Amino acid sequence: TTWKAYLYSVLTTTWGPVPMDAACKETYGNVYYYNSEAEVNMQILRWLDTAVDIFDPEGEKMLKDPFYPGTGGESDIEKWRKFANSLRLDIAIRMMNMKKNPEATTLAREQIEKALNPTNRNYLFTSNDDNAAGRYGTDPNADVSLYYERILKEFDLGTKLETELGGLTYPAMNEYFFCYMRSFQDPRLSKYAQQSRNNNTVGAKYESEKDYRAVVRDSLWSTKEKRFVQVSYRIPYLPRFEMKQTPSGWLTGKDEHNNDLQSLYSTASVSIEGYTYALVPRDFIKQDATIKLLTWAEVNFMLSEIQLRKEEWGINVALPQSAEQYYYNGINASMNEYGVTTGISEYLERDGIKWNTNGLGCHDYRNFYKADINGKGGYKNNLQQVWKQRYFATYFNGYAGWTLERRTRVMLSLIHISEPTRRVVI
């Protein structure tokens, strides 16, 4: 039931209305009944409510549990119960946005209170050992990760050159996410991305006396000379920037003396050639890569959000820690999850990261996107800190990032409306 609840939560969050009541049933006349997203989520909460209540560590177990195995390989029922209750909390929080459906928000409110009552609070994730995470297999022809099948397999088989690592297919940190990592000197950066390097050195032996960092050639304004000057400098991480230098909708500049000649400002780009991007570490896409579905860090950020919004939502819960404490717990849980041991205390003291502070961030190379964190000035600003840290903690989990952004719009993702279909691209 818990696994079915999770799968349906992904289906309805991704596509909206989906068949539930009529799933796997014979239909006539090509008529198919879809349940609304609210209906699906309400049923999911009912399933999870029942699951949390009936899980019995002393009862029957799956002998070979691939998801939450105990010491002998059998199901760890306590971990399954923690997953069910933590998932219930996550889905109920999402449903509080369904203000046009009072029945859905009423049930969500009830389930948040039930998930956090004195008994069920014990059935939330309390360490990274509780994280809901699946793992792919090692058979290249059957159960390896999709990224391995599409990307790494070609390198391992020798059908693709190692110097193509910087290509468009290999996942890398994008410029907008990197703005936050760089602006606030996030110690998770080295865990989230590999350092950029000269393509000619990929797979080769490094020489300690040489500098392999990417070289950037750029035009910067000289306050002394009062003009733009050409400069070159090295950077350890080269984020993947949007390949389209002139975005859709950009009014291209023209030279005022020649209508056929574009001006210097027709595109916004810098010259970076022959270097790999800040590629994701191999562990994220290897054959038996781990796929994290829900984590301890996320649970802490949920609790922080609830502490901030319980009056707004009319929720009667008494949690043992403050929103600020849960916020810091979430950051520390994420650091622990990725094995970060240094730079954490300094990070937590930086403006924008420290609770109830504002932090100014850098912008992308076209000056479209700025990585500020405005956490000062009341609970709505505190929420921005909580949501953005949750987004950072779910790196390389596209579903988690999409779900949070869809609900909060906190990352202010660049959105383009495609005509004439009015298709929204984020």
Describe the role of every protein-language-model region.
Residues 193-195, 398-407:
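Short coil/turn segments at secondary-structure boundaries
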Residues 1-333, 379-381:
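Structured, solvent-exposed acidic/aromatic patches
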Residues 309-401:
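C-terminal structural cap/anchor segments
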Residues 415-426:
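Single conserved hydrophobic/aromatic residue that forms the stacking wall/gate
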Residues 23, 62, 341, 348, ...:
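Residue-level signal for alpha-helical context at structural boundaries
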